[in-house]
Amino acid sequence: MASKNTYSDFKLATELPAWNQLQSLYEQKGKKLNVKDEFAKDNSRYEKFAKTFVNYDGSKILFDFSKNLVDDEILKSLIQLAKEAKVTSLRDAMFNGEPINFTEGRAVYHVALRNRSLKPMYVDGTNVTPEVDAVLQHMKEFTEEVRSGAWKGYTGKSITDVVNIGIGGSDLGPVMVTEALKHYATNLKVHFVSNIDGTHIAETLKDLDHETTLFLIASKTFTTAETITNATSAKNWFLSKNGGDQSHISKHFAALSTNATEVEKFGIDTKNMFGFENWVGGRYSVWSAIGLSVALYIGFDNFEAFLKGAEAVDKHFVETPLEDNIPLLGGLLSVWYNNFFDAQTHLVAPFDQYLHRFPAYLQQLSMESNGKSVTRGNVFANYSTGSILFGEPATNAQHSFFQLIHQGTKLIPSDFILAAQSHNPIENNLHQKMLASNFFAQAEALMVGKDEEQVKSEGATGGLVPHKVFSGNRPTTSILAQKITPATLGALIAYYEHVTFTEGAIWNINSFDQWGVELGKVLAKVIGSELATDNKISSHDSSTNGLINQFKEWI
């Protein structure tokens, strides 16, 4: 039963006085504000707008907001907007385990999963900390057994390969984190299967040895269609290799689920079942048992450091005044561009190959959370909400879509991420210095641009001149970490989680449900039964009928 408390006393963000004040500021100065001029006017601009986060282990991440299209007055009004939207009240409700996901009547408590200080955290009057810690201890024991070689397959061989079968949050998080922290891996290989396309599971199984492979089936309900279909194919492959002996399944399959009945029916020993509660949303689940593949890959101590890095950002988000609250500032800038500059997209470009899946992970976090059009006041929003988030690692991205960022007609606010220290400082750190020079240069170029006079001074004439002009004044946030460690990665993810939270709180939407994924699933079941027959289909619109019937002819 959904809670009636929508955690806001306004229906639309446009009702808030600060929203109207920001609209006036945009017209008066925002749309004409030139960042280059702002730097010239204020020698302390960088010191004022750059914020340093100190992690639990003393490592630092610098967030430079100074190249954004704001001044002191605009920033003050954005902070006032956060106050009027009661962002901190909603934040506190989340951290207190209240059911802020009101359409499903659930708490939003992924923050409890990284509570390594083990302080009491309650949902419905129950302290969930002991249960969360018990699952982590179970993960630790299992991880150490597998990594040490003590866990044996049915022929007595140790595990060499782990295959995580999941989809959505049960896949995107573990894939991204294992790639990002590959430097910390030892000899265990991890593979991920998510797509229902048979190619994904077939290509993954092709080179694996069934005697040394461990499968993790990641599905809270153990009924997710794509995941259970892929898991069943994996089980059939395993049985085809071992002579069909079902008793061996328990040595090669574990479940990340809470449905003991279905897990047991599948053949998995429930001792190897790792659960998590319904207050853990899929896109926030990498901190839970869903992160078991990560712990197996990098070791439990590193996984715990990953949790602690996120916990440190949680502490910052809760305790830091709004003016210096790094995730809150990131979220407010996003609202400023989306709603007042009509920016429809947001670029995240990591200047780090290990982070090559980070933008894909953030796509789900941002777009599934804030791709909503109805507010907590149960009315349709009369303003834009979630941005289209995209990105690729740089410098590759510079040779593909950066042209659009520099000279296109759309304003695309961008986040650039770099670690100062490389895990691979080859050629006397030459590669890292080239990478860093591009990180700094791209942000500077987007800000300063190049005017006609400069273009002409470089020898361009006539009709070529306008083609070589860069308007500049394109906003960027530069995020500079010391090194990509488990703690740093945990902190970066938590930063973007709380940015997303802040956006949703301002827009007064529920960032924690995802009804938009349901309709397609329902229709897919109907069409699935139609594909099982040879009959010509005529029950849909002519386009869908035509496509289905052509598919049936060609299959």
Swiss-Prot record:
D-glucose 6-phosphate binds at residues 169-170, 219-224, 364, 368, 399, 521. It is found in: Cytoplasm, Cytosol. One of its GO terms (biological process) is gluconeogenesis. The active site is at 368 (proton donor), 399, 521. Keywords: Cytoplasm, Gluconeogenesis, Glycolysis, Isomerase. It comes from the Eukaryota. The keyword Transferase does not apply. InterPro entries: G6P_Isomerase, G6P_Isomerase_C, Phosphoglucose_isomerase_CS, SIS_dom_sf, SIS_PGI_1, SIS_PGI_2. One of its GO terms (cellular component) is cytosol. Transmembrane segments: none annotated. It catalyses: alpha-D-glucose 6-phosphate = beta-D-fructose 6-phosphate. GO terms for molecular function: carbohydrate derivative binding; glucose-6-phosphate isomerase activity; monosaccharide binding. Its EC number is 5.3.1.9. Its main location: cytoplasm. Pathway: Carbohydrate degradation; glycolysis; D-glyceraldehyde 3-phosphate and glycerone phosphate from D-glucose: step 2/4. Belongs to the GPI family. Homodimer. In the cytoplasm, catalyzes the conversion of glucose-6-phosphate to fructose-6-phosphate, the second step in glycolysis, and the reverse reaction during gluconeogenesis. This is Glucose-6-phosphate isomerase. It comes from Kluyveromyces lactis (strain ATCC 8585 / CBS 2359 / DSM 70799 / NBRC 1267 / NRRL Y-1140 / WM37) (Yeast).
